[in-house]
């Protein structure tokens, strides 16, 4: 009996201790990239290069993108997961494929749950097709089951995520219309209760899978101080460990502000959120303009690097800012995912690789940032 008990304990220790090792310690400054499009880009034949790595004839040769960015200083990777996208990209299996590659490179991992079959953002939070007719209670159970299914699949691969997002850019709620926030009615229809309930269910499922995982609730526009949002979340039972923000400071058309104004407001906002809500902040998405060729590209690259340098230095000065993730920096050369074509969407113009397929100055600035610890 004693031998059986010993074997069971030993087996338990093995199962909880066989995760991939990370190159940088938990809680240190995250210099990350969201690389969720990488597998689709590779399938389309896109290649990545590093001017410092050439063959014996002096010719550039293709590099593994994750390995190369790791060499430049990347220590974390963010990956989105959709419930059931028609193409299969960013579904569980695709996310697992990329997560395993990142883990093999010693990366810390963030999983970004959209709880949708396609992009979720402030203007779109579409219930997955398979969940369309669910009641609120059934949606809560679906959120729980989906979260556990994905996280236990990671655990089976020996991957222990450090962070998990319960929803993507959700200032207006999630799983619309059931969890859509209607600010005018001050929760008269229970919308805040339902949205906060979804975050709580996701939070508890994440903690069931990984007890010490950091759970993030993520909103857009780091330059906007939404203290009222976080107060309402608390009031209605929402749960989180860390606040996540997006920041695209060169998009004046969105904000009507200059990039120095947006960076300054973002710094003030991050400091105020940390002070008022006593939790750390993560910049889950950042992006700088990246387009053109020849002299046009060179001018854009220089300006983007100035903006990035300013923003990184501001965030480095804040003890409880835990890091910055660049959103899809690997995109270059006008590439766009297949589903964008029938939608009439253009390519993403805030990637951070040059027209020659090499990391830009702005990306190198982020990945070479020197803050070693982030105190929470």
Tell where the protein language model's regions lie, with residue ranges.
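Hydrophobic faces of well-ordered beta-strands that scaffold small-molecule active sites
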Residues: 30-35, 77-79, 109-113, 162-166, ...
């Amino acid at each position: 009996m004693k031998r059986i008990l010993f074997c069971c304990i030993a087996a338990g220790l093995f199962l909880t201790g066989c995760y991939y090792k990370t190159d940088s310690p938990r809680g240190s400054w995250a210099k990350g990239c969201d690389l969720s499009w990488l597998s689709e880009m590779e399938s389309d034949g896109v290649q990545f290069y590093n001017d410092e790595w050439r063959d014996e004839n002096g010719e550039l040769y293709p590099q593994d993108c994750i390995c190369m960015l790791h060499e430049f200083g990347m220590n974390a990777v963010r990956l989105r997961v959709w419930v059931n996208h028609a193409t299969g990209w960013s579904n569980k299996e695709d996310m697992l494929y990329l997560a395993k590659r990142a883990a093999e490179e010693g990366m810390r991992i963030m999983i970004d749950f959209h709880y949708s079959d396609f992009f979720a953002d402030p203007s779109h939070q579409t219930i997955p097709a398979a969940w369309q007719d669910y009641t609120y209670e059934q949606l809560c159970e679906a959120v729980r089951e989906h979260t556990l299914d994905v996280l236990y699949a990671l655990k089976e691969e020996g991957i222990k995520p450090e962070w998990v997002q319960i929803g993507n850019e959700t200032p207006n709620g999630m799983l619309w219309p059931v969890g859509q926030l209607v600010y005018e009615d001050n929760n008269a229809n229970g919308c805040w209760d339902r949205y906060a309930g979804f975050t709580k269910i996701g939070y508890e499922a994440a903690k069931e899978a990984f007890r010490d995982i950091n759970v993030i609730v993520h909103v857009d526009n780091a330059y906007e101080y939404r203290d009222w949002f976080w107060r309402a979340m608390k009031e209605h039972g929402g749960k989180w460990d860390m606040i996540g923000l997006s920041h695209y400071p060169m998009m004046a058309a969105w904000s009507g502000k200059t990039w120095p104004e947006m960076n300054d407001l973002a710094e003030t906002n991050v400091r105020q959120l940390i002070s008022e809500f006593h939790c750390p902040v993560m910049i889950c998405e950042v992006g700088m303009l990246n387009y053109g060729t020849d002299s046009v590209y060179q001018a854009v690259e220089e300006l983007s690097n100035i903006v990035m340098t300013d923003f990184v230095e501001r965030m480095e000065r804040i003890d409880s800012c835990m890091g910055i993730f660049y959103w899809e920096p690997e995109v270059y050369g006008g590439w766009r995912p297949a589903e964008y074509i029938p939608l009439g969407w253009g390519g993403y113009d805030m990637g951070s690789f040059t027209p020659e397929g090499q990391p830009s100055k702005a990306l190198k600035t982020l990945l070479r940032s020197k803050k070693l610890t982030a105190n929470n």
